[in-house]
């Protein structure tokens, strides 16, 4: 067994749902084509460790994620849009530095991982809430799922982007119909 210490089905169900979402994502031929267009140089686990290795990256991701959390909790559209603009500005700046230091391939790889993990993580948490999971981390706004960018950062930012998209009324089926690679934030449309 992969996780022998997990014997409670309320913890297994969310993990299974997470992986099923990946299967659904790749069942869209256009999305599969877009994912195959990415060159993968580092393993997902290695890339998720970059914030621990590069303090400037961790700091930038915290700034981005804080903007996402503020946008999600904003009381009105104007306030939300201000935080979204800040997020997009921080993200653009960080990606430019990543492009300079790590290369375009790593940036695109991050974007592909974030897109893949965003909806999978969101559905994992939602299914955990539905089955009343015994795992204390399964709350919609837990530190583990919403803020811990030093570990699995593209899971965190992707999850929070999906939460923002739901608040904004963005169709969650968006990335699965294009054969072209696009960053998840490119689906944000604000005035």
Regions found by a protein language model. Give the residues of each.
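Active-site recognition of the HExxH zinc-binding catalytic motif
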Residues: 14-27
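Pan-zinc metallopeptidase signature
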Residues: 89-191
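Short pre-active-site segment immediately N-terminal to the catalytic Zn-binding motif
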Residues: 1-16
């Amino acid at each position: 067994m992969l996780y022998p210490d997990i014997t409670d089905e309320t913890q297994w169900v969310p993990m299974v749902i997470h992986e099923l979402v990946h299967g659904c994502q790749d069942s869209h031929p256009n999305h599969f084509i877009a994912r195959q267009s990415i060159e993968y140089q580092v393993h997902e686990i290695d890339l998720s460790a970059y914030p621990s290795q590069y303090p400037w990256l961790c700091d930038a991701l915290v700034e981005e994620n804080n903007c996402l959390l503020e946008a999600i909790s904003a009381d009105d559209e104007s306030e939300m849009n201000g935080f979204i603009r800040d997020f997009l500005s921080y993200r653009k700046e960080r990606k430019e530095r990543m492009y300079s230091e790590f290369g375009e391939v790593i940036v695109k790889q991050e974007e592909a991982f974030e897109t893949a993990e965003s909806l999978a993580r969101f559905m994992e948490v939602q299914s955990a809430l539905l089955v009343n999971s015994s795992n204390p981390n399964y709350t919609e706004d837990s530190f583990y799922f919403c803020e811990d960018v030093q570990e699995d950062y593209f899971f965190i930012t992707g999850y929070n982007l999906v939460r923002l998209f739901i608040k904004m009324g963005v169709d969650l089926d968006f990335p699965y119909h294009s054969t072209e690679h696009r960053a998840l934030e490119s689906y944000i449309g604000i005035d």
